[in-house]
Amino acid sequence: MALKERIGTVVSDKMDKTVVVAVINRYPHPTYKKIVSKTTRYKAHDPENSCVLGDRVKIKETRPLSAHKRWAIEEILNKTIMSKEDKK
């Protein structure tokens, strides 16, 4: 089975070595054909604590690392510059 990859935005970095990544999936509604957006939040392993809020990242599927972590940060695509006032 191939490993899955997703691209999303970091929405929480308050845990140690873990970030929450929101991935938006767009698909047409089966009956009405309107494009529907569904947001899925994944907990991903960030061993160096290098991700901050707002970063655009690529995550990949991995073995279970904890009760809820099944994903790991593969690379940071766009880095966000956060000031100290924004962090609070």
Swiss-Prot record:
UniProt protein name: Small ribosomal subunit protein uS17
Organism of derivation: Prochlorococcus marinus subsp. pastoris (strain CCMP1986 / NIES-2087 / MED4)
SUPFAM superfamilies per record: Nucleic acid-binding proteins (SSF50249)
UniProt GO molecular function: rRNA binding; structural constituent of ribosome
Organism lineage: Bacteria, Bacillati, Cyanobacteriota, Cyanophyceae, Synechococcales
Superkingdom of source: Bacteria
PANTHER family: 40S RIBOSOMAL PROTEIN S11 FAMILY MEMBER, SMALL RIBOSOMAL SUBUNIT PROTEIN US17M
Signal peptide residues on this chain, from the entry's feature table: none
Keyword rRNA-binding (UniProt): yes
InterPro entries: NA-bd_OB-fold, Ribosomal_uS17, Ribosomal_uS17_bact/chlr, Ribosomal_uS17_CS
Family: Belongs to the universal ribosomal protein uS17 family.
